[in-house]
Amino acid sequence: MEMSEVKAQIKDYVRDHYKYYGWYPYDVQVGDVLYSYEEYMDILSMTL
């Protein structure tokens, strides 16, 4: 899976989670990989 696909999936999940719960998730799983808050925020801030 390309990083742009990973970023898009993380972004969708994080937005939905924030919309329904009012806070960002502690971690996000994409495929078989579990990203911590710090890791997925780094990915979301990347310029691709």
Say what each PLM segment does:
Residues 2-48:
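Acidic, low-complexity, intrinsically disordered interaction modules
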